[in-house]
Curated annotation (Swiss-Prot):
Protein family (similarity comment): Belongs to the glycosyl hydrolase 2 family. Beta-mannosidase B subfamily.
Keyword Hydrolase included in the entry's annotation: yes
Name of the protein described by the UniProt record: Beta-mannosidase B
GO biological process: glycoprotein catabolic process; polysaccharide catabolic process
Lineage: Eukaryota, Fungi, Dikarya, Ascomycota, Pezizomycotina
Organism: Aspergillus oryzae (strain ATCC 42149 / RIB 40)
UniProt-listed Enzyme Commission number(s): 3.2.1.25
GO MF annotation list: beta-mannosidase activity
Length: 844
């Protein structure tokens, strides 16, 4: 009995423009997976589309069809074994031919395919595998033109994209280029076997007291002959040590066992405990020979989405292992427009950055792709909760029978693939499709519960989100929460702040509110909000080649910002708050200050509301990352270089964070008058599960002199409420008694150490003289590649930002420094002889 074997078909490929019939048209492909844009670059037929205006010169690639070909030899095949040609992903309209005969046609990028080629490979020797990738943009347009009755309402990109099951951002988005890829975007291989384990999954029951857990494991077997003589040997282990073992026979090609685990190690999100991962393994055996084995990492945990009526409306927050978790985190877009270029190492670095930023949840956005296994593995291992959108975004999708069939296959395949990951806590039907329904005035009668009726309306996609997808999740992953859309709340208008989740874009988009009042604009769970900022100069210098183009309004910089009206919006928020500048380096920094302040005001206020009966259950900023070097809402750029906002968010999400703020006075209104008094508030937010005692101080320091304008307030033995908010005090600033501008500087000590700081500044910054701060940055110790810097100032300093240098990490940045409160920053990665990191602060 031959064991399972597989042969990757990753090398030996060539490709060409499908229309070019000349023999010299064929070009070598370095490695598969790949897409045509990558392979054209490798053959010097295409300039890097991420530099300058090269994206425009690459547009021709989008309109072409491409053919890939390889020659391989038939592998050794034992009697009774089959040969399967397995494709994990074809982008998108693919016709696969083996020795000239069509063996597969695919039109869904998000599906895997398995083709039995045993008979086709009966002959020994060489065999030719050829794949034609038809132009997706052309096919999309043709499909749209065939259905003139459908309302193709959408945001972003060509509405025809909705006819095709392909990453929607490939049609261009307001943060990315228009690069429509084609190719073998995931692994292709030959598998040879008489029997194999085709699926392994578990169902976990955790007792309410967490003292026991029941792990039911299931293995599905693909075999050509009877499975009566096979057995499945299951092993459950933790950190390499056996927990339980059991052998099972197969019934209807499925084997299952149940393990009772005592004192289970639970999987927790980062900051709440260890993300313990068990390994479930199964070995398929016949006549004491191992035929095939599979193993997966799983977690023992419960995950609930709590939606209950309360005085604010209806709650929306996550409860993990019985603990309410404020989900501070980010939205995720694909990390590259050329998806096969993203390595497992790069995925892990992104998730490591999230953990370093104290972020708990990542939302996989519905206009990209179901991510690579290594993405979810990193989330599992590092304790990051995943909000997983299905791949529908910003549109009214058609529901032709053949499209619904493809979508159902897509959902089945991906939920099967992903369901063992403990990090995934919610599946969500779409991104902003209900907002498209609202804006286009499409029919949505929430009280009509007949799915067949939905298909007859001008919003037929409701059938996908409220019937098809939840049915798949219920069948394949019944313990995972399903939510119809983002944003969505019980069929109400998507801007309703009392129910469901909310995309709050009235800062930046919409009414362009002041970011200082961001916290008043939120809902029960703020799953999108953002503010643009330029990336660091090192990133700009990558895509801006000419020195003459290095000024804020240059054509190439505009070209690399795809957001509608970006210049007006950036300018508005800059001139309202800061003294503007025309040199690029300062301008870049100023946009970053605005982004950092915006994120701070939002997160800080919404986390405070967590303590008000879970008024706000979480905040996922738009967006964590970029898909190319650009100017966008990302808080970390394409090259994994954090912007100042990354650090501002990390501080607000500390296990214990202190907050201080005075009421916002809007100087931009007609006939604005200086306020006679201003109220202020001081509070502590904690995600710890037990009460903590601390000492809190509030100082009132002159911006101009650095001296106290009134006596500090000190409170000892403050009891800090666990997993909530502790309101410390409210006060009033008398502007007649203290007329000079001053900051409110709060510090919190726990166990004798400063654990949190916050500084509230007079607004707007443009009215303040922030020159001559008396800032000093001194190296106080050095050990190996680690340095400690002590930062002090004679006058309050706003937003001290350290240079982001590749391979170097700073423990904090975008810091406010006040007199009498020196702060220490750890720099890791500097070698002997390296220049010290540069830094910049507001008013420098």
């Amino acid at each position: 009995m031959a064991a399972f074997s597989q042969y990757p078909l990753s090398t030996g490929w060539s490709f060409k423009d499908s229309d070019d019939q000349s023999p010299e048209a064929w070009m070598p492909v370095p490695v598969v997976p790949s897409v045509a844009h990558q392979d054209l670059q490798a053959n010097q037929k295409l300039k890097n589309p991420y530099i300058g205006f090269n994206e425009l010169d690459a547009r021709w690639v989008n309109d072409k069809s491409w053919t890939y070909r390889t020659v391989f030899q038939k592998p050794a095949v034992a009697a009774g074994s089959s040969i399967i040609l397995a494709f994990d992903g074809l982008d998108t309209f693919a016709t696969v031919k083996l020795d000239g005969s069509v063996i597969l046609q695919s039109d869904n990028m998000f599906l895997a395919h398995r083709v039995d080629v045993t008979k086709a490979l009966e002959a020994e020797g060489d065999h030719v595998l050829e794949i034609d990738f038809d132009c997706a943009m052309r096919r999309a347009r043709e499909l749209r033109e065939k259905d003139t009755k459908h309302n193709w309402a959408s945001f972003n990109g060509d509405p025809a994209r909705m006819a095709v099951r392909k990453a929607q951002y490939h049609w261009g988005w307001d943060w990315g280029p228009l690069l429509s890829t084609a190719g073998i975007w995931r692994e292709v291989r030959l598998e040879v076997y008489s029997a194999k384990i085709s699926d392994l999954w578990t169902e976990v029951e955790l007792a309410s007291d967490h003292q026991t857990a029941r792990v039911s494991a299931f293995a599905e077997v693909d075999a050509a002959d009877s499975v009566d003589s096979y057995k499945a040997s299951f092993l459950l282990s933790l950190h390499g040590k056996e927990v339980a073992r059991e052998v099972a026979t197969l019934k209807d090609k499925v084997a299952n066992v149940t393990f009772d685990v005592t004192q289970p190690s639970l999987w927790w999100p980062n900051g709440y405990g260890d993300p313990a991962l068990y390994e479930i393994s199964v070995s398929l055996e016949k006549e004491d020979c191992e035929i095939h084995s599979v193993s997966k990492k799983i977690g023992i945990r419960t995950a609930e989405l709590i939606q209950q009526p309360d005085r604010h409306g209806k709650s929306f927050f996550f409860r993990i292992n019985g603990v309410d978790v404020f989900c501070g985190g980010s939205c995720w877009i694909p990390a590259d427009n050329l998806l096969p270029s993203i390595t497992a190492e790069r995925y892990r670095k992104w998730i490591e950055l999230m953990v370093a930023g104290r972020q708990v949840m990542i939302r996989v956005w519905g206009g990209g792709c179901y991510e690579d296994d290594s993405f979810y593995q990193a989330c599992d291992e590092l304790g990051v909760l995943v909000w997983q959108d299905f791949m529908f975004g910003c549109g009214n999708y058609p529901t032709w029978p053949e499209l619904l069939e493809s979508i159902e296959k897509e959902a089945n395949y991906n939920v099967r693939r992903l369901r063992h990951h403990p990090s995934i806590v919610v599946y969500v039907g779409n991104n902003e499709d209900y907002q498209v329904q609202e804006s286009a005035g499409l029919v949505y009668d929430y009280e009509d519960k007949n799915p067949e009726n939905w298909l007859k309306t001008d919003f037929p996609a409701r059938y996908i989100y409220e019937k098809l997808l939840p049915s798949v999740v219920e069948k394949l992953s019944p313990k995972t929460v399903y939510h119809p859309g983002s944003p969505w709340g019980d069929g109400k208008i998507t801007s309703d702040p009392t129910v469901g989740d909310m995309h709050q874009w009235n800062v930046w988009h919409g009414t362009q509110e002041k970011y200082q009042i961001f916290d008043t604009l939120g809902g029960r769970f703020n799953s999108e909000f953002g503010m643009e900022a330029f990336p660091h100069m090192s990133t700009i210098e990558y895509f801006v080649e000419n020195e003459a183009d290095k000024y804020p309004q240059s054509h190439v910089l505009d070209f690399h910002n795809k957001a509608d009206g970006h210049e007006r919006r950036i300018a508005t928020y800059l001139v309202e708050n800061l003294r503007t500048a025309t040199d690029l380096e300062t301008y870049v920094y100023l946009t970053q200050v605005v982004q950092a302040e915006t994120m701070m005001f939002g997160y800080r206020g919404w986390r405070r509301q967590w303590g008000d009966e879970r008024h706000c259950g979480g905040a996922l900023l738009w967006q964590l990352n970029d898909c190319w070097p650009t100017i966008s809402w990302a808080i970390v750029d394409y090259f994994l270089r954090p912007k100042p906002a990354f650090y501002a968010v990390a501080r607000v999400l500390k296990p214990i964070a202190v907050g201080v703020r005075r009421e916002h006075h809007d100087w931009s209104v007609t006939h604005a008058q200086p306020p006679k008094t201003s109220k202020y508030e001081l509070w502590i937010a904690s995600s710890l599960q037990k009460e903590t005692v601390g000492t809190i101080e509030l100082r009132f320091l002159s911006v101009n002199t650095g001296l106290d304008v009134r006596a500090p307030i000190l409170r000892d033995n403050v009891k800090i409420v666990p997993n909530g908010t502790t309101n410390i005090l409210e006060g009033v600033i008398d502007h007649k008694a203290q007329p000079e501008p001053h900051v409110l500087a709060a510090r919190l000590w726990v166990d004798g150490e400063v654990t949190a700081r916050d500084v509230d500044w007079p607004q707007p910054f443009k009215y303040l003289d922030l020159s001559d701060r008396g800032l000093e940055v001194n190296k106080v110790s050095e050990s190996g590649n680690e340095q400690k810097l002590l930062i002090t100032a004679k006058k309050p300093v706003k937003c001290l930002v350290f240079e982001e240098r590749d391979g170097i990490r700073v423990s904090d940045s975008a810091m406010d420094i006040v007199p009498g409160d020196g702060q220490t920053v750890t720099v890791t990665g500097l070698k002997a002889g390296d220049a010290p990191l540069k830094y910049k602060y507001l008013g420098q």
